């Protein structure tokens, strides 16, 4: 009984907080389901009001996701009744239906899903367009709002993906490789004496590490930066020297700053792209 009443008080507190933010339904939610995190953005009158993240938990139930979403909304003083509509993009099919069902528990608003049938403004020149991750398409849409191609999107999560958009605004292909955090974790797990290191800590001043940790930092920070620079040069060779590069996701700042290629980092690139696609399709 004590646990029940504790839960009752907790849930009551949540709903009381949400009640403070009640208003007219004018909030558009964007939901991006990645392999590691679920990113939720809230827009009012074309302005991003909040952006929050949840852990992408494959074991969480619909009800648990509904509670997590409600908590996040309450944290930003948004009531479910304020939601006018929304859009969801996902690279984790197993979670797509669960998160959509959780959203429908909270709101009767219509949620679009990024996929065939939605207009994006980007033509896909790929062997199988259905295989393109929603995050990459949304990133390309947001980057093109800054200006026409050629450009490339660098999306860093568990993997690093780089996708190219040519001067005709066509997404024409790219590369996928393991992200530095994943590679480091695999290396540490499969060796006896290599320690875990913090890739967000500054790399040594010299590429020549003088101890094991410094060698790992140089290898992963400068090595990943050099890898990205090399790929960027190859992208420019195919797309043109004026190619612009955008990055988003969990690529550590240390790696971005070690790159010699000018890269525009935008934390909300995918979120902004989702909202742009919603605007194109809101009356569909």
Predicted regions and their residues:
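Glycine-rich phosphate-binding loop plus the immediately following alpha-helix
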Residues: 57-64, 132-134, 139-148, 172-217, ...
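N-terminal glycine/serine-rich phosphate-binding loop of ATP-dependent small-molecule kinases
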Residues: 2-114, 118
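Gly/Thr-rich phosphate-binding beta-strand-loop-beta motif of the actin/hexokinase/Hsp70
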Residues: 26-49, 143, 147-171, 187, ...
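Long hydrophobic alpha-helical segments typical of transmembrane helices together
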Residues: 238-284
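Short beta-strand-loop/turn "lid" adjacent to the catalytic site in phosphate-handling enzymes
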Residues: 78-132, 168-175, 179-180, 210-221, ...
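A short, acidic, amphipathic alpha-helical segment used as a generic capping/interface helix at domain edges
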Residues: 224-238
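Glycine-rich phosphate-binding loop signature in dinucleotide/nucleotide-binding domains
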Residues: 78-81, 146-149, 238-241
């Amino acid at each position: 009984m004590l646990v029940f009443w504790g839960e009752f008080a907790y849930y009551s507190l949540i709903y009381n907080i949400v009640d403070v933010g009640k208003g007219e339904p004018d909030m558009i939610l964007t939901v991006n389901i990645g392999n590691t995190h679920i990113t939720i953005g809230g827009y009012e009158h074309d302005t991003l009001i909040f952006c929050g993240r949840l852990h992408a938990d494959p074991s969480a139930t619909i009800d648990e996701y509904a509670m997590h979403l409600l908590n996040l909304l309450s944290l930003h003083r948004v009531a479910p009744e304020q939601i006018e509509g929304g859009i969801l993009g996902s690279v984790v099919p197993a979670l797509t239906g669960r998160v959509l069902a959780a959203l429908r528990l909270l709101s009767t608003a219509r949620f679009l899903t990024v996929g065939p049938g939605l207009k994006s403004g980007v033509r896909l020149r790929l062997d199988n367009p259905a295989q393109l991750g929603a995050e990459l398409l949304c990133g390309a849409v947001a980057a093109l709002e800054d200006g026409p191609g050629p450009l490339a999107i660098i999306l860093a999560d568990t993997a690093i993906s780089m996708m190219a958009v040519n001067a005709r605004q066509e997404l024409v292909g790219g590369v996928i490789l393991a992200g530095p955090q994943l590679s480091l974790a695999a290396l540490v797990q499969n060796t006896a004496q290599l320690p875990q290191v913090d890739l967000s800590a500054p790399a040594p001043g010299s590429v020549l590490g003088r101890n094991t940790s410094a060698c790992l930092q140089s290898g992963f920070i400068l090595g990943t930066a050099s890898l990205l620079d090399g790929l960027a040069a190859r992208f420019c060779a195919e797309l043109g020297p004026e190619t612009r590069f955008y990055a988003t996701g969990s690529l550590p700042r240390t790696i971005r700053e070690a790159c010699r290629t000018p890269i525009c980092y935008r934390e909300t690139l995918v979120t902004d792209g989702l909202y742009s696609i919603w605007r194109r399709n809101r009356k569909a």
